[in-house]
Regions:
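Charge-rich, well-structured scaffold segments of protease-associated domains
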Residues: 1-121, 138, 188
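His/Glu-based metal-binding/catalytic segments typifying zinc-dependent metallopeptidases
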Residues: 122-178, 184
């Protein structure tokens, strides 16, 4: 349809010819800094940040995914352009298309979308996660509810047991209030 074609063309422009406007970057940086500052007062965010640092140490997984106030304030347009050039590449793109389209149409659309992207065969592998020593951390906070995290990195995502273990973890405790563990603790 015409709307679908227009949407695809618009998406190609956004993906293939991004506009790294300094004014927008500055506005979004201020918004992110405010969100990070607010999160630093919230017990769940504090616990999550400390937990990730505890189990991953200096590995990139140990860094807060939202960044830090300092890291956000240091981002320049040149950093965005470099990141785009290195990582928005055809040979690493996963394009997901959902809707009223056949597989042949979806493949054609995906090829069209990715055809304007460069290829980069020099993407660094993610470092191996090193096991950390057993530790217990307690954080004093005036919250009315405790946040308890426990865990250890045990396998890579490409391990054949990863997905079954992920589902089991989700059912037992990883899904928050929908988990069996939470049900046992809160309801019984």
């Amino acid at each position: 349809s015409e709307e679908k074609s227009e949407a695809i063309e618009l998406f190609k422009i956004v993906l293939q010819k991004p506009n790294f406007d300094k004014e927008i970057l500055d506005r979004e940086a201020k918004r992110y800094v405010a969100n990070i500052a607010q999160a630093e007062t919230m017990p769940e965010a504090i616990a999550t940040k400390r937990f990730m640092k505890s189990i991953y140490g200096e590995h990139p997984y140990g860094l807060p995914s939202s960044g830090t106030i300092d890291s956000i304030n240091r981002i320049k347009v040149s950093h965005l352009k470099k990141f785009y050039k290195e990582f928005y590449v055809a040979n690493q793109a996963d394009i997901v298309i959902v809707g009223d389209v056949t597989q042949a149409e979806a493949e054609s659309i995906a090829k069209d979308i990715s055809s304007g992207l460069p290829v980069n065969n020099n993407i660094k592998a993610i470092p191996v996660v090193k096991q950390v020593e057993k530790q217990e951390t307690r954080i004093s906070h005036p919250a009315k509810q405790a946040h308890l995290y426990y865990g250890v990195p045990i396998m890579k995502r490409n391990d054949p047991d990863f997905f079954p273990l992920y589902v089991g973890n989700h059912v037992l405790g990883g899904s928050g209030f929908g988990s069996r563990l939470t049900h046992e603790i809160r309801e019984k």
